[in-house]
């Protein structure tokens, strides 16, 4: 099922399984995974997109190999909070995953995640060219970590 509300998503996640974070792009997808305790988001990879079918198959392999039970995808709202064309593409992509693999997905506001990823790389003295290669997975980590932090608050 697709959730736009983290509060509802938290109620349905399997806490014994890991959570995958995705920073969706038209050319690349940044991927992060939670640790086994669902406390920390860890960078996994940047997947270069090929075709919808191949993309879904590759993601499926990753979530089977890593015991993933749910997914968080960055929701690319405009700075004003308005949905844009990329938001529609994210929803279509998420619905394809749900239809094919019956997994719960949460769309989470990703405003500023790419800017924060770029800033973190700069602070770490990573060259711009190297930074561009990892920005997507850093963004995926930031998106996923925000949701993991919300889950922690609910568990207190």
Swiss-Prot record:
Its EC number is 3.1.-.-. GO terms for biological process: rRNA 5'-end processing. InterPro entries: RNaseH-like_sf (IPR012337), YqgF (IPR005227), YqgF/RNaseH-like_dom (IPR006641), YqgF/RNaseH-like_dom_sf (IPR037027). It holds the Pfam family RuvX. It comes from the Bacteria. It is an enzyme of class 3 (hydrolase). SMART domains: YqgFc. GO terms for molecular function: nuclease activity. The keyword Hydrolase applies. GO terms for cellular component: cytosol. It is found in: Cytoplasm. Belongs to the YqgF nuclease family. Could be a nuclease involved in processing of the 5'-end of pre-16S rRNA. HAMAP family: Nuclease_YqgF. This is Putative pre-16S rRNA nuclease. It comes from Ehrlichia chaffeensis (strain ATCC CRL-10679 / Arkansas). The lineage of its organism: Bacteria, Pseudomonadati, Pseudomonadota, Alphaproteobacteria, Rickettsiales.
């Amino acid at each position: 099922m697709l959730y736009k509300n983290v509060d509802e998503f938290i109620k349905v996640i399997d806490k014994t399984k890991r959570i995958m974070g995705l920073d969706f792009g038209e050319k690349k997808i940044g991927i992060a995974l939670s640790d086994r305790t669902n406390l920390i988001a860890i960078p996994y990879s940047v997947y270069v997109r090929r075709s919808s079918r191949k993309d879904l198959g590759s993601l499926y392999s990753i979530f089977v190999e890593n015991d993933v039970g749910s997914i968080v995808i960055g929701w690319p709202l405009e700075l004003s909070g308005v949905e844009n064309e990329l938001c529609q593409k994210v929803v279509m992509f998420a619905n394809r995953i749900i239809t094919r693999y019956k997994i719960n997905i949460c769309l989470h506001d990703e405003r500023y995640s790419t800017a924060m990823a770029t800033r973190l790389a700069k602070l770490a003295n990573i060259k711009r060219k190297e930074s561009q290669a990892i920005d997507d997975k850093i963004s995926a980590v930031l998106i996923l970590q925000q949701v993991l932090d919300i889950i922690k608050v609910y568990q207190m």
